[in-house]
Amino acid sequence: MLGRPVFGLGKAITSVDVAVIDANSEWIGVKRLQLMENAGRSVAEEAAKLAKPGSRVVVFAGPGGNGGDGLVAARHLAYMGYQVTVVMIVKPEEIRSPETRAMYEALAAMDLTVDIRIARAPADVAPVEADVVIDALLGTGLRGAPRPPYSDAIEAVNSSTGLKLAVDVPSGLNSDTGETPGAYVKADITVTFHKPKPGLLRRPDVAGRLVVVSIGAPPEAEVYVGPGDVAYRVRPRSWKAHKGSSGRVLIVGGSQDYVGAPILAALAAERSGVDLVFLAAPEHVTRAASHHPTIIPVPLRGSPNIHPDHVKKLEQLLDRVDAIAIGMGVGLSDETKEAIPQIIVKALEKEKPVVVDADGIKILGERGIPNSNRKLVVTPHQREFQILFGDALSGVDEDIKARALKAAEKAQRHGLVILLKGPIDIVTDGERIRLNRTGVPAMSVGGTGDTLAGITAALLARKLEPFHAASIAAFVNGLAGALAYAEKKDSMTAMDLIEKIPEALNNPIEAANRVPAYQRLVRGRIEWQPPVGRSES
C-alpha cells in the first residue's frame, strides 16, 4: 500500500503546481497581490525570529514574484523596527511583475525607514554586513544556471555576514529536481509557501532548515481543478511543430446498434488540439463519419461489431498513435467482449495510455482489469463503477469524502486513474484526489461522456500525465458544456459542447469567468492537513 491518499496535488508541489494554485486562487477570488502580501509578511515574521528589533536586515530582490515577496518582507520588517536595506538588482523600470512593481512603489515611498540601493552595474552588487540576509532573487520558475546579474548577487549573498534566509527556494536551486547547475544560495533557513517543493526535500544541504508557511491560498484552489490547470499544464504548439508532433489519437468504438458515440469522441479529440484523429469502427460507423473529412477513417470490415479478427489491424495502427480511447458504443456482443480486452492489453504493452469508457468499462468489469502502471484511465459513472469494481458507491448526494476515498482505494489497488463522473467529478490515481465542479444539469444529454473520453485521450496524446489529463478533461468538458448551455439552454447537445471546447481549452480563465457561479453541491467535508511548520535539516 502507498499510504493514505491526499486531496490536492500531493504532499510536495512542483513549480507548475505553484503557478496552477496561484491562478486558481485568483479565480476563486484571492488575488495574486494578496498572496504576495501574505507571503512577504510570513517571511518577515520568520526573519524576526532570527534577530532582535534594531538589527540590520538586507534584502536582495529580483524583478519577479520572488522579489516582490522580499519587498513585502522589507516593509513589514521596517515596521517592526529593523534597519532595512533593499538591494534591487535591476532598475525599477525593469520590474516585470505588476504585483512586484506595486510593492516596489509602496516601498519607494518609505524614505525614512528603508534604504533602497539600485544595482545599475555589477560592481553595485557586493557582499554586505548584516544580521539577516534575505535572498529574494529567484523563485520556483528557475530553469538552468543563473546568469549575471543574478549569479553576481548570489555570490554576494553567500559572501555576506549574517544568517541567510531564502524566500520560497534558495536562488539557483531547481525547486523540482534539486539540481544546482550554477551559482546558488546556501541558505541557513528557507521559508517556503503552501507546501514543500521536491527540490527542497532533496537538498537540505542547500535549503537549510525548512519552514512551510501559509500564504492564504484556499485549499479549494488545489483540490478543485481550475482554469490554472489548463493554462499552465496544456502547452500551445511549438513553432517547430510538424504534423503528428502535437499528438495522434485512436478512437475505437461503435457497433451494430450505436453509431454516434465514437464519432463524438473523435470530434472532441480533434477540437482538443491534437494533429491527427483516427476512427477505427465497423464500416457503417466510418461511413457515417465520412462528412467529417478531417477524421481519418479506419473501417473494420467483416462484422457489424468489433471482432477479434480486427485486433491484428488495430495492433499495427497502435504504432502510429500516442493515445487511445476505447469503449464508446461498442455494445456487449460476445465477440466484442473478447476483442476489447485484447486491444487494451496490446496498447498498454506498447506503452500507449488508454482511456476506457462506457461499454468498455462494463467489459473490463466482466473480463478483468489489466495491469497498466497508471497508463489506464477509466471514466465510469456510479453504476459503471459498481460493475467495474464490484463495490457500490454511496449516492451522489452523500458524503464526497467517502466516495473519493473509495475511488482512491480502487485506483491504488489496480494501478490506474479513475475519473468518476457525477455532479462533482472525482479524479484519483490512488495517491492524489482532485474534484471538478464545472458543468450544468443539461449535460445529462447523450454524448457528453463520449466527448469527455475524447478530450482525455487528446490530452494524453499531448503528453500530459494521466492524472492531470483526466483532471483537466473533466474541467474542460464541464466548462465547454456550461458555455454551450449559456447559449442553447436546455436545447444544448453534445455537438454544441464540442464547438465550445476550443474556447474552454485556449482561454480557460476568461471562459470560466463568464459562466454562472458555482452552486454549492458538496455533502460533507474533506480532510485538509496543512503542511505548515518546521522540518529540520
From Swiss-Prot:
Region annotated ADP-dependent (S)-NAD(P)H-hydrate dehydratase, chain positions: 227-537
GO MF term set: ADP-dependent NAD(P)H-hydrate dehydratase activity; ATP binding; metal ion binding; NAD(P)HX epimerase activity
UniProt-annotated stretches for the region NADPHX 2: 381-387
Keywords: ATP-binding, Isomerase, Lyase, Metal-binding, Multifunctional enzyme, NAD, NADP, Nucleotide-binding, Potassium
Assigned EC number: 4.2.1.136, 5.1.99.6
Cofactor descriptive note: Binds 1 potassium ion per subunit.
Catalytic activity, as annotated: (6S)-NADHX + ADP = AMP + phosphate + NADH + H(+); (6S)-NADPHX + ADP = AMP + phosphate + NADPH + H(+); (6R)-NADHX = (6S)-NADHX; (6R)-NADPHX = (6S)-NADPHX
CDD domains: YXKO-related
Entry keyword annotation includes ATP-binding: yes
GO biological process, any: metabolite repair
Binding site for K(+): 66, 135, 171
Alphabetical list of PROSITE patterns matching this protein: YJEF_C_3, YJEF_N
Record's protein name: Bifunctional NAD(P)H-hydrate repair enzyme Nnr
Taxonomic placement: Archaea, Thermoproteota, Thermoprotei, Desulfurococcales, Pyrodictiaceae
